[in-house]
Structures are given as structure tokens and as C-alpha cells.
Amino acid sequence: MFGFFNNKVFDKGYLPEFEGHEIYYQQMGNPKGEPVLFFHGGPGGSCKDSHGNYFNLKKQRVIMFDQRGCGRSKTEDIISLNDTKRLVKDANRLLEYLNICEPVTVAGGSWGSTLALLFAEKYPERIARICLYAVFLARREDMEWMLRDSGLFYQIGRAHV
């Protein structure tokens, strides 16, 4: 893990309120480094300083944000005007707010991998690279596995203890 000893946040704040949501963001790593836009898992998760451990913080500028209704982002109504398209647009608004014009690496895991792929599809001109882990595509079969079949892992594991 590259960032383990150097995952200090150098900038944090909120995007200006839009549609009743204030989006929390933070940046870590090299302020002049290659920009990486990180999408956390969930839905309902949040960005954590430990997510910096996935990156080379001496060379990369890692931008993280708490999605609408998550973590330190603020809203009166976490459901209203909170959908996948808006989450992707919020990510683009964040890059604009931070004056990041060059293509970025998008990264994410689980639900974050879904959002990273949707971001790349919506804004292909903004993409330098895509880095995904624990990929979740939010297809019907993925939902069925998550809600029903994933329990098989626990049953199998318990049988071997």
C-alpha cells in the first residue's frame, strides 16, 4: 500500500449547495500530482483517509467525496433528488470546482466501481485511466447475488470452522 504513511488530507470542504445537497470532498497526496477521482462504495458509504492507501500519494492527487446523503455530505432530505445520474454529475461538478481540466484516473470499488464506469461513459473526454476493484455492475443478476446468493459464502465458511 503506497499511501499508508502519507495519507494526510491537504484540502477539504464542501461543493456549493445544489439541489438541496452540499457535497463533502477532500484531497490527499501531491497537490501537483496526477489527479485521481475516487468513488467510495455503498450506497451509503463514505470516503475515508484509509482509501488513500490504494494510491501512490507522492505522485498522485487523490480527490474523494461523500456522495449525496452519505458521510459528511449535508442535506435535509437524503432521498430527494438523489439518483445515480446526479451522483455522476456531482463528480463532474467537483472536478470543475477544483479547476481540474485534464483527464483523470477514475477509481472505485463495489458501488464506487459502478459510479466510476458511469462517469467514464458520461464524460469520456475526462478519462485518462480506470482502476476498479470489487466490481459491482448493479445488473439484475448482481442484485440477486448480493441479496440472496452471497449468503452461501457464510454457510460454506461456517461448515469449515
Predicted region positions:
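Conserved HGGG/HGGXW glycine-rich cap/lid loop of the alpha/beta-hydrolase fold
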Residues: 17-75
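Conserved alpha/beta-hydrolase "nucleophile elbow" surrounding the catalytic nucleophile
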Residues: 108-110
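Conserved acidic catalytic loop of the alpha/beta-hydrolase fold
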Residues: 86-104
